[in-house]
Amino acid sequence: MIDPRVLRDEPDRVRAAQVKRGLSDEVVDHALSADGERRRAIAAFEAKRAEQKQLGKLIPQAQGEEKQALLAQTKTLAAEVKQAEAAQAVAEEAWQAALMSIPNLAADEAPAGGEDDYVVLEEIGTPRDFAADGFEPRDHIELGRMLGAIDLDRGAKVSGSRFYFLTGAGAELELALVNLAMQQARESGFTPVIAPSMVKPRAMDGTGFLGQAADDVYRIEGQDMYLVGTSEVPMAAYHSDEILDGGALPLRYAAFSPCFRKEAGSHGKDTKGIIRVHWFDKVEMFVYTTTEESYAEHQRLLAWEKEFLEKLELAYRVIDVAAGDLGLSAQRKFDCEAWIPTQGRYRELTSTSNCTEFQTRRLDTRGRFGSEIRPISTLNGTLCAITRTIVAVLETHQQADGSVRVPKALQPWLGREVLEPVTT
């Protein structure tokens, strides 16, 4: 959640941030009203408690009828105190709900607008010219079939639409990508983590995924648990309710986990293949650091993402995501999009967000800096989302006979230079 002091002291700044995201600014007035109600409820409760304490001092000194009258008054006042306490709890809950509904304040540098209002920051590499190579590129579905790497028919038979099996070279390619990603992360100072893919509601809500993204989340009926759409969720909750040593920051983690997404708003989009699926595996970078250092750390996360894509010898671009497409918790987000030859366009492969103090305030994670305890910041960044990366690698490095050249960085993990077709 945002800093309550910013809401109280700079409400116009919060209103402007809402408008920049394309959202109504009425939520600001609602939150300020809830804050006022909460303060009045606290004052009323404290006044009743003070009256109760004062009355308690008079009773031992009273005698006879006066004492009986005071005792009767005590009973009445006790009920009023209980009522005032309940009213305070209701007001506090309403205030917290109002505050939690406000998204992080988008960075001044983030473009205004929605999904299509991003700004292209740079383009790296040149999309391959298949005409010059003398053949028409196959899409990843056909390549996956020829290589015996992707089985969509059996995925649909067993689990339904947007599911798949990775087999043979496909399974090997996933493991190679995970190993390469984890090797890079470890060499860059990250601690490898295998994260749980089921979490309690607080972890999901604390990361902002029960707000705008609630429709895309799988809930396990009868258990009050959720399947995560990214290991950002368990890693943000990893240090919940903790005070970290400020001198030990940054803490960098590289977490591997399955990711589950309903893709509720994606009807009719990418219905074939493995670009948009209900389940995929991912290596995610996650960082705890000071707010002051978070902006430079964000650039470092982007640099590590770019390094990984360049190891895979992919043409890609970096975009500055517009405020309306940031999601609840992000202050700023950069996406790396790889060129997909058969689609003739760039598609998102990685994303990195600076969430500043938004998640740590919700999850009560703070840092100790000498005698001071204060909120810290979190950042996240995709190092390798497996299925989309497989799509980009297969389509970019395919050869005329349906074989696929293995990028040099992956060759030690795959043990060969070329993936050969098993069928035509």
Curated annotation (Swiss-Prot):
Domain of life: Bacteria
Keyword Mitochondrion listed: no
Positions annotated to bind ATP: 261-263, 277, 348-351
Pfam families registered for this protein in UniProt: Seryl_tRNA_N (PF02403), tRNA-synt_2b (PF00587)
Subcellular location: Cytoplasm
UniProt: L-serine binding residues: 230-232, 284, 382
Catalytic EC class: ligase
GO biological process: selenocysteine biosynthetic process; seryl-tRNA aminoacylation
Pathway(s) it belongs to: Aminoacyl-tRNA biosynthesis; selenocysteinyl-tRNA(Sec) biosynthesis; L-seryl-tRNA(Sec) from L-serine and tRNA(Sec): step 1/1
UniProt similarity note: Belongs to the class-II aminoacyl-tRNA synthetase family. Type-1 seryl-tRNA synthetase subfamily.
Functional note: Catalyzes the attachment of serine to tRNA(Ser). Is also able to aminoacylate tRNA(Sec) with serine, to form the misacylated tRNA L-seryl-tRNA(Sec), which will be further converted into selenocysteinyl-tRNA(Sec).
Subunit (UniProt): Homodimer. The tRNA molecule binds across the dimer.
Record's protein name: Serine--tRNA ligase
Gene, per the UniProt record: serS
